[in-house]
Design a protein with these regions (language model features):
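Conserved nucleotide-binding/hydrolysis micro-motifs of P-loop NTPases
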Residues: 17-20, 37-43, 102-106, 129-134, ...
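C-terminal or mid-to-C-terminal helical accessory/interaction module adjacent to the motor/catalytic core
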Residues: 84, 91, 131-215, 279-283
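A conserved hydrophobic secondary-structure block that centers on an alpha-helix together
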Residues: 101, 296-298, 302-306
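Intrinsically disordered, low-complexity regulatory segments
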Residues: 1-158, 167, 172, 241, ...
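Pre-Walker A segment
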Residues: 263, 267-288, 293, 299, ...
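C-terminal helical "lid" subdomain and adjoining coupling/linker elements of P-loop NTPases
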Residues: 175-179, 194-255, 302, 326
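Basic, low-complexity terminal or inter-domain segments flanking catalytic cores
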Residues: 2-11, 21-22, 29, 146, ...
Length: 933
């Protein structure tokens, strides 16, 4: 521990409030421990700048692009109270310890704290790889100064992302749609997903056939084998076909269904024999300990966690002292961790399960940063999952168990055994030679598999690689006779490339060296929130809007969605972090162009974009004469008008909405024609409403099938008669006011029930649907009770009090008495008996009120009783932490009242204006982005 300060007190600042209690317990009364709650300063929105700066070189980005990209900082509105509190505490201590995280973001937070607090006492920088007593004690022995190179790298990244987004996003708004955004990593991630969907759209399936057989030995043991060759030529499998359905090799036999069935029949009575037996030793090594990237991948495979949930749960485990720091590219373990893992493996599984020498691993990541250890259980002796089960939530326990197993297994012995490969064959009655193959692996020593086995991603091949699967074959020798008990011809179809899952997208981004694994969760959440991607059955499906965005970026901003270029930017940021590259020169090359490589800068590209044909950008050819267009209200199909051969007149184009649940690769030429045919129709006429005389039709719309009434438009004569009947009103000057035309009547519309079908729905069904809401009657106080169908299903309504009912069919059968019985039960909603909160997350440091998650009309939302914010679609209630809730509420406050404050008030925490020099000084202006989750 450090030497005591003069008055026995020192202030230690961490990032997260959840660390405070744990660290305070280790340090005792000599220290005041507090948190900054993430970043305290950031670049403001340009609209929030003081008036005198809005029109200058700072006005566009809140960065002075003419003065070495000097950033203009303000203290975040929701952090002013926290900064004031830290300043008060700093007056009562004799030393300041900045213990924010040890990555770029954490280093920047420490720098900003020092700049804003302006301490007059000694300042020490320290980091904790884990929140344990031992780690904290070691950290006090490794105190250092703030690493200004790391701060430079973070500042460069923040300015880079600001410039990238602010220059390119407005182009998307003008040419594709409002509310869209471009980002250095998010745009590349979106391109990956779109490119995979393009591959699926262009894919042509190929059919191929083979034979499978069940064979019996003379000792009556059975095993399965598969046809691999006919007349000495290998039989084609899925890997032999290109994505256009053609064979990639002429040296294979492509069996048709007829050939396969004929061969199976001809082999029915043929005598089979073993032609060769080959046995090889089998060895499998354990996987390396977790990095940030591999943890997200494996948690997605094994636990079905999204990347964001994984990082949130890992953050809680780290801050509570259960695991080491969770943002790392390193696969290395410290000496004490290796000893702990080997010792525990030996105790749990036996000494034979631990190799004689410790295992070491090398990173495979393209841009790995080895500053931290791999993710592992905290401490010099690991707690088993059973030992911590009672103190962790279910998600925390499952992730801890995964990390513990992976860490232990990484220091265990190889799994060993043997793999046997057998070839057997026969001559068919039609003279053709058929050869079958079978293989089996027998694991004689499980080694690390006793603790853990790594998951795998889905592949596109039907014949998935099963080399690690354990399967035993009977004892066989060359020449042994076999009987074919069962032979079957089997048809197969090649599969398109699988869509990305969160796990495989994270893996690809990591392998390409794009972005940092610690930001992948936020990147994936962003592309979901922007509507570029949605999750369907675990796969990432791009929207048609994403197609338009990617096409625009590829054609007008090609380098900025290029994988190699984006990866190189990440390498350059690493060089800046190591002090090998100047941030000012690098940003100048990026924005203005030039440099050693004569790069074309972003500014000249934007300044010389020329005319971008928005219609062309938002058009995707589906088939000859059929185009999908991304419109203001969603995607739709358009077919070219046809020419009347007799008159030469061209008909208007035919249009049809595209269902929201139809994936891009499912919109084939045939499907497009089907939708257009439906679009030509005004709907299926069901009959006439006897009450109104209006025609009732059933249609298929973008959001599913529905029924509606056709209300004839008023004729010019009717409109004029209406206007003539209206009294004339006059302006004050005596001139008559123009009369307003009547508003068109709005037709009644109702979605079909889930149990109904567009082709069979009747007029009676339609009239019932259009009659909703149905009035059941009134209660004893005279309040009307109705029943209707809504977004979340059928429900009763009495004033503001709504109650769900069982099924859609009950809408037409439920009685007033049954409704009154439901209302007589304890209320689950409404003011009189509010539903308990879905979650309680602690006290908000800004409002000092309890934060809860409630169920609202439009879904769950977070509130402290003053500020409300909807739970983001990319997050779950279970994954929300106190820190995340505080962050979301702070963001909402910043977007609301904070913007209405006079701009001058936001300049109080402006960064120091000292210009950067070659030799870094503590007064050098720097910035900070929102801390990554």
């Amino acid at each position: 521990m450090p030497t005591k300060a003069k008055n026995g007190k020192a202030l230690l600042i961490v990032e997260s409030p959840s660390k405070v209690k744990t660290i305070s317990g280790y340090l005792g009364n000599e220290f005041l421990v507090d948190s900054s709650m993430g970043h305290i300063r950031d670049l403001p929105q340009p609209s929030e700048l003081p008036e005198n700066l809005k029109k200058g070189p700072v006005g566009k980005f809140a960065v002075n692009i003419d003065d070495d990209f000097d950033p203009y900082y303000v203290v975040n509105p929701d952090k002013k109270k926290k900064v004031a509190e830290l300043k008060r505490k700093l007056k009562d201590v004799d030393a300041l310890y900045l213990a924010t995280d040890g990555d770029r973001e954490g280093e920047a937070i420490a720098w900003h704290l020092k700049e804003v607090l302006k301490p007059k006492v000694p300042v020490y920088r320290m980091t904790f790889p884990e929140i344990t007593r031992e780690a904290i004690e070691r950290a006090f022995g490794e105190l250092r100064d703030i690493d200004l190179h790391l701060v430079d790298a973070q500042e460069t990244r923040r300015i880079l992302d600001r410039i990238y987004g602010y220059e390119i996003s407005p182009v998307l708004w003008r040419k594709v749609g409002r509310g869209l955004s471009a980002g250095r990593v998010q745009s590349v991630a979106t391109r990956l997903v779109v490119e995979r969907e393009r591959e699926r759209m262009a894919f042509v399936a190929a059919n191929y056939w083979d034979l499978t057989g069940h064979f019996i030995t003379t000792s009556n043991e059975g095993f399965d084998a598969k046809l691999v060759a006919v007349d000495g030529t290998r039989v084609a499998t899925g890997k032999d076909f290109a994505d256009d359905g053609t064979l990639t090799s002429t040296k294979v036999t492509h069996l048709s269904e007829a050939e396969a069935r004929t061969l199976a029949e001809a082999l029915t009575a043929a005598p089979f024999s073993v032609r060769s037996v080959e046995t090889k030793p089998y060895k499998r090594r354990p996987a390396a300990p977790f990095t940030t990237s591999t943890l997200q991948q494996e948690a997605a495979r094994k636990l079905r966690f999204s990347s964001r949930v994984t990082m949130q749960v890992a953050q809680r485990l780290y801050e509570s002292g259960y695991i080491t720091y969770m943002r790392t590219d390193s696969v290395a373990l410290s000496d004490q961790a290796v000893k702990a893992a080997r010792r525990q493996a030996s105790e749990l599984y036996g000494t034979e399960y631990v190799p004689s020498a410790p295992r070491t691993y090398a990173s495979k990541s393209k841009n790995a940063q080895e500053a931290h250890e791999a993710i592992r259980p905290a401490g010099d002796a690991f707690r088993t999952p059973d030992a911590v089960r009672g103190t962790l939530s279910n998600d925390e326990y499952r992730l801890y168990e995964l990390i513990w197993k992976r860490t232990i297994a990484s220091q265990m012995a190889d799994a060993t055994g043997s793999t046997a490969s057998v070839r057997l064959g026969a001559t068919a009655s039609n003279g053709r030679d058929a050869e079958f193959a079978a293989s089996g692996t027998v694991i004689t020593f499980r080694g690390f598999l006793a603790a853990y086995e790594e998951g795998v991603d889905a592949t596109r091949l039907a014949e998935r690689d099963a080399k690690n699967a354990e399967k035993r074959l009977p004892a066989l020798a060359q020449g042994d006779s076999l009987t074919a008990e069962k032979l079957e011809a089997a048809g197969h179809e090649t599969l398109p490339p699988p869509r990305y899952t969160e796990a495989s997208l994270v893996k690809t981004l990591d392998e390409l060296g794009i972005g940092r694994p610690s930001t992948y969760a936020a990147v994936i959440s962003t592309i979901m929130d922007r509507g570029y991607v949605q999750v369907r059955s675990g796969s990432l499906v791009p929207s048609w809007t994403a197609f338009s965005v990617v096409r625009l970026l590829e054609t007008s901003f090609g380098p900025y969605v290029n994988y190699e270029f984006t990866a190189q930017m990440e390498e350059d940021l690493d060089r800046i972090a190591r002090g090998e590259e100047s941030r000012v020169e690098w940003l100048g090359d990026f924005y203005f162009g030039g440099g050693v490589q004569k790069k074309r800068g972003l500014k000249p590209i934007v300044d010389n974009l020329g005319d971008i044909d928005a219609r062309d950008i938002n058009s995707i050819r589906i088939a000859d004469g059929i185009v999908l267009r991304v419109g203001k209200f969603g995607p739709y199909l358009e077919a070219e008008g046809t020419v009347n051969t007799e008159t030469g007149e061209v008909s208007d184009p035919v249009r049809a909405n595209v269902p929201t649940d139809l994936a891009p690769d499912e919109l084939t030429a045939e499907k497009a024609k089907e939708l257009l045919e439906q679009g030509k129709s005004d709907g299926r006429v069901l009959g006439t409403d006897p009450t109104t005389g209006n025609q009732i039709i059933a249609r298929d719309g973008r959001y599913g099938p529905y029924v509606t009434e056709v209300i004839e438009e008023m004729t010019e004569e009717q409109i004029q008669a209406y206007l003539d009947a209206q009294p004339t009103e006059y302006y004050k000057n005596g001139k008559p006011k123009p009369k307003k035309k009547p508003k068109p009547a709005k037709p009644r519309t109702a979605s079909l029930f889930k149990s109904m079908d567009l082709a069979t729905v009747t007029l009676e069904d339609a009239l019932k649907l259009l009659s909703l809401p149905r009035v059941l009657g009134t209660d004893a106080e005279g309040n009307e009770i109705t029943v209707q169908n809504g977004r979340f299903g059928p429900y009763l309504k009495k004033g503001t009090d709504s109650r769900s009912i069982g099924s859609e069919e009950e809408i037409f059968t439920i009685t007033l008495e049954q409704a009154l019985d439901i209302y007589a039960q304890p209320k689950q909603r409404g003011r009189a008996a509010a539903k308990p909160p879905l979650a309680e997350l602690g006290v908000d440091p800004n409002s000092e009120k309890n934060i809860v998650v409630k169920d609202g009309r439009f879904g769950p939302y977070i509130t402290d009783g003053v500020t409300n914010i909807t739970v983001p679609r990319s997050e779950t209630i279970e994954s929300l932490t106190h820190e995340r809730a505080v962050e979301l509420l702070a963001e909402k406050r910043a977007k609301g009242p904070a913007k209405r404050k006079p701009a001058a008030k936001k300049t109080t925490a402006k960064k120091s204006t000292a210009k950067k020099t070659t030799a870094k000084k503590s007064t050098t202006a720097k910035k900070t982005a929102a801390k990554k989750d």
